[in-house]
Amino acid sequence: MNPKLLIVIGLLLATGVCSFAKALDEESLRKECNHLNEPCDSDGDCCTSSEQCISTGSKYFCKGKQGP
C-alpha cells in the first residue's frame, strides 16, 4: 500500500476518534436544565434560556429573566 495513503488514512481515523471523544465529553458535561418555577441550587444553576435561577428568600427558583 502507498505510504502517503496510509498516513492520510491514519490522520482521518485520528481526527474521527478525537471528534467522537469530544462529543462524548460534551454530552457528559451537559445536564438537563430546570424550567420555570422549578427549584434550582444557586444563582449559577442551569435554567432554560429565557429564565434564570433567582433567590426567593431561603430558596432558589427558575424565574423569567429581568431586564435586557
From Swiss-Prot:
Keywords: Calcium channel impairing toxin, Cardiotoxin, Disulfide bond, Ion channel impairing toxin, Knottin, Nucleus, Secreted, Signal, Toxin
Record's description of how this protein is used: The peptide(14-39) may have biotechnological applications as a drug delivery system targeting cancer cells, since it lacks pharmacological activity of the wild-type toxin and has selective internalization properties in specific cell lines. It is directed to the nucleus of six neoplastic cell lines (SK-MEL-188, HEP G2, Caco-2, MDA-MB-231, A549 and DU 145), as well as in rat cardiomyocytes, and rat heptocytes. However, it is unable to cross the cell membrane of six normal immortalized cell lines (HUV-EC-C, HFF-1, MCR-5, HEK-293, BHK-21 and MDCK).
Disulphide bonds in the chain: 33-47, 40-53, 46-62
Transmembrane helix found in the keyword field: no
Cellular localization per UniProt: Secreted; Nucleus
GO molecular function: calcium channel regulator activity; toxin activity
Tissues/organs with expression: Expressed by the venom gland. In intravenously injected mice, the labeled toxin has preference for heart, liver and lungs.
Signal peptide interval: 1-23
GO cellular component: extracellular region; nucleus
Record has Secreted as a keyword: yes
Function: Cell penetrating peptide (CPP) that increases intracellular calcium release through the activation of nuclear inositol 1,4,5-trisphosphate receptors (ITPR) of cardiomyocytes, thereby causing an increase in the contraction frequency of these cells. In vivo, this toxin is not lethal to mice, hovewer anti-CPP serum reduces venom lethality, suggesting that this toxin is lethal when it acts in synergy with other venom components.
Family listed: Belongs to the scorpion calcin-like family.
Domain notes: The presence of a 'disulfide through disulfide knot' structurally defines this protein as a knottin.
Record's protein name: Intracellular calcium channel modulator CCP-Ts
Taxonomic placement: Eukaryota, Metazoa, Ecdysozoa, Arthropoda, Chelicerata
